[in-house]
Structure formats: structure tokens, C-alpha cells
Design a protein with these regions (language model features):
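Extreme N-terminal signal-anchor transmembrane helix of membrane signaling/transducer proteins, especially
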Residues: 3-34, 38, 42, 332-333
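Cytosolic-side ends of inner-membrane transmembrane helices, especially those
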Residues: 10-12, 25-30, 329, 333-354, ...
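Extracytoplasmic/periplasmic sensory segments of membrane signal-transduction proteins
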Residues: 42, 47-49, 58-176
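Hydrophobic core positions in alpha-helical repeat/coiled-coil coupling domains, especially the HAMP
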Residues: 44, 62, 352, 359-362, ...
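Solvent-exposed, extracytoplasmic
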Residues: 50, 74, 80, 111-137, ...
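Extracytoplasmic/periplasmic ligand-binding sensor regions of membrane-associated signaling proteins
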Residues: 124-228, 278-281
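Extracellular/periplasmic juxtamembrane segments that couple receptor/chemosensory ectodomains to their
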Residues: 257-328
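Amphipathic coiled-coil signaling helices used for dimeric signal transmission
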Residues: 365, 378, 382-404
Length: 405
């Protein structure tokens, strides 16, 4: 392919330019991706850690706010008065009365006397005003008495009797009271994905539960700080439970995805860090994560006995965009250098080959008997020396030929 000297010289120059270029691009990619990967991973871990601290503050703030309702003298007095109706009744009679309302509850309209008494009494108006001040964060608030019957609510609840529900039993805690947070779930009554804050209302001595308040918080508003995190086109944060369920993120409906078991096992072994793995959508990603550390503000059985983690992740192709941009720049510079090498090599090759072509043509003419042919090569190198030697040989041959004639 490159039989001529000129072609070989050009080929050699291209190879000399190409090999360092390939090595440079490879080292740039390997070194750059390693540094970028570590930098992004560390930054994502730090962002996840801050998000987890934010999450803890949000939950603790909500507990404090709901607790402020639970200790309100106005609410406590109303519940104490409501509980008086049980004093003159036996347990069977109480159960019978509660069941009689529970059985007809689904058929009752908002304008029925029973419902109006619950959603329009003075405590109901009080918690409605409180809910209004909180905006869209609270989807529903209601209060039960000591037996689990709803006595005040912002709107009609799905059930009248609540004492057979897990959340009520946890918050009641055998009459001793305990702050309980439910697992995130879809609430049929409020029609939202919700986190329920269940706070016991204690008597004045703070030793006996007299009622329970339940606040149903819409997680889209409660966790807006998670939803609003965006990094580039694909980067965002997720709130993930220890069973792998993505509770909420910026791009999917709540509770609609699960991450792979390998990833959840990896993060469960650490309180925080970063890793490379497939995210909940099966996309290779850089993922920073941090465990949400809770205090002692709620019972250990809260949140479905699950841990929560914050993920901050981004698709790897997008994360590596700066490296790809650098590679393009390095490649363009490499192509330009190869072009320059080629042009320089072509110029040098022509300077080398031109005397050789003159030499070739001249030797051919001398060989044909034209002994007066002289090689006009003035280069001060081996080719010039060879041309002078051939010229001397031609002169000698010409003289000998003339003598013979």
C-alpha cells in the first residue's frame, strides 16, 4: 500500500501523530472519569446527607405541630366532656352504640345529623381553621374519643370506629400513649398518598389517654423538598424505604417503583456513601445515599418498621458529559495535529523524493548512452554526494569512450 518512499514517510508521520493521540485520549478518559466519578459521588453523598437531615427536621416539626393541637386545653376539655357519656354505660352497651353508627356510616350523607354533629362542632371548626392555615399539606384531620369513635373531623372519614385500626392501637398503647407514624400509603378517605401523624391526647396528669388526633399529611406537599431537587436533565432525589420501595421522587407517582435488591442490600450495610448501580428504572447511575436518622419522637414500630434513605442520583451518560466534551476537544486537537503532521511529512517527503526522482531519471539516461547527461542535484547530503559520484562516473565513461573512438 505504501511502497513508495513518499507514502512511507507520510504513513510514518501519521502513525507518530496518531499513537500519542490515542494514548492521550485513553488516559484522559480513564483519569477524567475516575476523578469526575469520585467528585460527583462525594457531592451526591453530601447532598443526600443534607436532604436526610432536612427530612428529619420536617418530620419532627410536624410532630411538634400536631402535638400542639393534642395539648390544647380547648381540645382536651371537649374530649373529656365527650367521654363522660361512657361513664353511665357498660362495655356491651358502648360497643352496641358504636357499632350501630359504624354499620350505617358508609350510607350517611354530609348533611345527616350524625355527620353534621361531627364535622360542624366547635372542635371540628377549630381543626378546620388549623388545616386551612397549613395550606394543602394536611389532607384531613380528625379526633377520636377514648373508645376510638370519631368525635370531630374536617370532613367525613371512611370509618366511624377507629379503635380496631393499627395506627389507633399503636397511638393508644394500652392507655399509656405513644406517638405513631404510619407507613406511607394511599388514603381512601383523603384520596392522597399520605403519611399519618397519630398523637395521643393525654389527661391533665399526662398519664392516661383520653383521645387520639390523627393528621393525614399529603406527601407531595410534605416532601416537596425532595420532589423539587433536580440535577441536569436526569438527576433527582428519591425517598426510599428499606424494603426497596421508592416512596416519592420527582418523576414518578408515589410508591410506583422498587429498586433492585442488590442496591438496597449495599446501602443497608452503610449509613451513607455513594455507588454505581442501576436505579429504580434500570438505568446505570451514580447514586449518593444517606440513612435518615430519627430521634426518639415516635415509636419504634412507626413507618412500618422500615428505615428510610435519601438517594441523589443521575444517569451516568449525563454525569460524564463534561468528560465526553473534553474527549471531543482532545480528539479534535489530535485530528488537527495529525493533519499538520501529514502536511509537514508531505513537504519533507517531497524534498527527499524530488532529488531521488532526478537521480533515477538521470541514471536512466546515462544507462541509455547519454554520457553527457549531468545530475543537477545540489543537496548537501548523501543523495547529493551520490549524484556527484554518478556525474564523475559519467565524465570518466565519456572520456574513455572518446579515447576508444
Amino acid at each position: 500500500m505504501f511502497r513508495g518512499i513518499q507514502g512511507k514517510i507520510i504513513f510514518l508521520a501519521v502513525i507518530i501523530g496518531l499513537l500519542p493521540g490515542i494514548v492521550g485520549v485513553t488516559l484522559t478518559y480513564l483519569g477524567g472519569t475516575h476523578l469526575l466519578k469520585n467528585s460527583i459521588g462525594s457531592n451526591f453523598h453530601e447532598l443526600a446527607r443534607k436532604e436526610s437531615e432536612y427530612m428529619r427536621r420536617v418530620i419532627e416539626k410536624e410532630i411538634d405541630e400536631v402535638h400542639s393541637l393534642a395539648i390544647s386545653p380547648f381540645i382536651r376539655k371537649y374530649i373529656e366532656d365527650a367521654n363522660l357519656k361512657y361513664n353511665s354505660k357498660g362495655n356491651e352497651e358502648i360497643i352496641r352504640e358504636i357499632n350501630s353508627i359504624e354499620n350505617i356510616w358508609p350510607r350517611l350523607k354530609d348533611n345527616s345529623p350524625i355527620i353534621r354533629e361531627i364535622i360542624n362542632n366547635e372542635i371540628a371548626e377549630y381543626i378546620k381553621e388549623y388545616k386551612k392555615r397549613e395550606g394543602e399539606e394536611y389532607a384531613e384531620i380528625f379526633i377520636t374519643d377514648t373508645k376510638g369513635a370519631v368525635i370531630a373531623a374536617t370532613n367525613k372519614t371512611s370509618d366511624y370506629f377507629q379503635a380496631d385500626e393499627k395506627w389507633w392501637e399503636e397511638a393508644y398503647n394500652n392507655g399509656k400513649g405513644s406517638v405513631y407514624l404510619s407507613d406511607v400509603e394511599y388514603d381512601e378517605s383523603a384520596k392522597v398518598f399520605a403519611l399519618n401523624f397519630c398523637i395521643p391526647i393525654m389527661d391533665k396528669s399526662n398519664k392516661r389517654v383520653i383521645g387520639i388526633i390523627k393528621v393525614i399529611a399529603d406527601i407531595k406537599h410534605l416532601f416537596s423538598g425532595i420532589i423539587n431537587v433536580h440535577i441536569g436533565e436526569t438527576g433527582h432525589s428519591d425517598l426510599v424505604s428499606s424494603d426497596g420501595t421508592v416512596i416519592i421522587d420527582a418523576i414518578s407517582p408515589p410508591l410506583s417503583w422498587k429498586i433492585n435488591e442488590g442496591l438496597i442490600s449495599k446501602i443497608s450495610a452503610s449509613r451513607g456513601g455513594w455507588t454505581l448501580d442501576k436505579d429504580e428504572h434500570g438505568i446505570n447511575s451514580i447514586i449518593g445515599f444517606s440513612h435518615v436518622e430519627w430521634g426518639s419522637k415516635f415509636s419504634a414500630s412507626s413507618l412500618g418498621n422500615k428505615n428510610w434513605y435519601i438517594f441523589v442520583r443521575q444517569d451516568m451518560p449525563e454525569a460524564y458529559t463534561p468528560i465526553f466534551g473534553l474527549l471531543w476537544k482532545v480528539s479534535i486537537v489530535g485530528v488537527l495535529l495529525i493533519g499538520i503532521f501529514t502536511l509537514v511529512a508531505l513537504s519533507i517527503a517531497r524534498q527527499i523524493v524530488r532529488p531521488l526522482l532526478i537521480l533515477q531519471d538521470g541514471v536512466g539516461l546515462i544507462g541509455q548512452g547519454k554520457l553527457n547527461q549531468r545530475l543537477e542535484i545540489k543537496t548537501k547530503d548523501e543523495i547529493g554526494d551520490l549524484a556527484n559520484s554518478i556525474n564523475s562516473m559519467a565524465v570518466e565513461l565519456e572520456n574513455r569512450t572518446n579515447e576508444l573512438e
